[in-house]
Amino acid sequence: MTISKIVKRINEELAGELLTYGELETFLDQVIDDINHQLDSKFPAFSDFSAETYPDRYPDYNFFPEEYIRNVVIKGAAYKFYVMDEEGIPTAQMFQYNYQDQLFLMLRDYLEYVPEEFKKDGYSAVRLYDVAWKEPWVKYDGI
């Protein structure tokens, strides 16, 4: 999805705000940071995404499926905006629940499909299928 479409959809989520990409970039970066933390990945932040750094992709931010752009990035940026906006604090809680649900679904459904180039080195979770237990109740004697 192009940056202009992302900005348009965020403004629609924000009940017709007219924020520019420059005003939303911080919130978009925060969402990408959350995604990277959840998926143990290194997708580029929007502030690092330019024609110079990604000439083959710019202006289409397509590092993961568009479904997650719509359901996680756009909703997450709207939530991050409402948290910072004094008038939006009552609305922020509804956006928070929706954003957290969608972030969890992204973790559940997309974790194994993160492209190799965007995976961090190492794992942040225990990978139980790498352990050679014969029976779950039998003590494992080493690796």
Question: Where do the PLM segments sit?
Answer:
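Elongated alpha-helical scaffolds
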Residues: E67-G76, K80-F81
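Short, amphipathic alpha-helical segments
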Residues: E67, N71, P90-Q93, Y97
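Short secondary-structure subsegments characteristic of cysteine-rich extracellular domains
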Residues: A92-R108
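Conserved short "hinge" loops at termini or chain/domain junctions
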Residues: M1-N62, I89, R108-I143
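Broad hydrophobic/π-residue packing in well-ordered secondary structure
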Residues: D34, T53, R57, G76, ...
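Short helix-capping/linker segments at secondary-structure and domain boundaries
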Residues: F81-T91
